[in-house]
Amino acid sequence: MVHYKLTYFNARGLAEISRQLFHMAGVEFEDERINEEKFSQLKPTFPSGQVPILCIDGAQFSQSTAIARYLARKFGFVGQTAEEELQADEVVDTFKDFIESFRKFVIAVLSGESEEILKNIREEVIKPAVKTYTAYLKAILEKSSSGYLVGNELTWADLVIADNLTTLINAELLDIENDKLLKEFREKIIETPKLKEWLAKRPETRF
């Protein structure tokens, strides 16, 4: 039996989608959560000096998107055709572009910056980025007959976006109660039985 170990901090962050994919597929894995001290000790042993790290029977692999894409493909969450797989990748890459603007806010929060600085980042960087990003998502959902972002089945793109919407809500950067389309999409995904089970028992973290 293959042994999987996923190493990351005690946060959703860059490892959460991989964790969700393991649970959605019903595949056992070791969810190793490390602190900064442990990371400093292990860093020299990691391929790129970064986490998350997926260890498969002792072989290490890095890069969060590569890991999640591998698991999605292996467990059947990439769509039913090559074109659907391409579309799922497109959605995830659009999310990654958006996250670059969001990263500045996360760093400011974790660094303890003043509320004034956080407010400036929200107004000047985050809000315009959120508007463009959510418009892109809603354009896809408006054309969807299934309620999913890609095809007629849940894909890893749905997991990525639903998790990100949760982060935006928690950071008070998205008023989803006034956005019917995104609210219905997020609820559809997080109410998926196996995912709902994981969300109920995972450790509570801010990001």
From Swiss-Prot:
GO BP annotation list: glutathione metabolic process
Origin superkingdom: Eukaryota
Keyword Transferase in record: yes
Residues in coiled coil: none
Domain GST N-terminal stretches: 2-79
Domain GST C-terminal: 81-207
InterPro entries, sorted: Glutathione-S-Trfase_C-like (IPR010987), Glutathione-S-Trfase_C_sf (IPR036282), Glutathione_S-Trfase (IPR040079), Glutathione_S-Trfase_N (IPR004045), GST_C (IPR004046), GST_superfamily (IPR050213), Thioredoxin-like_sf (IPR036249)
Keywords from the named record: Transferase
SUPFAM superfamilies: GST C-terminal domain-like (SSF47616), Thioredoxin-like (SSF52833)
Reaction catalysed by this enzyme: RX + glutathione = an S-substituted glutathione + a halide anion + H(+)
Record's keyword annotation contains Transferase: yes
Database matches in PROSITE patterns: GST_CTER, GST_NTER
One Gene Ontology term of the molecular function aspect: glutathione transferase activity
Enzyme Commission number(s) from the entry: 2.5.1.18
Binding residues for glutathione: 8, 43, 49-51, 63-64
Role, per record: Conjugation of reduced glutathione to a wide number of exogenous and endogenous hydrophobic electrophiles.
Similarity field: Belongs to the GST superfamily. Sigma family.
Protein name: Glutathione S-transferase 3
Source organism of this protein record: Caenorhabditis elegans
Encoding gene per record: gst-3
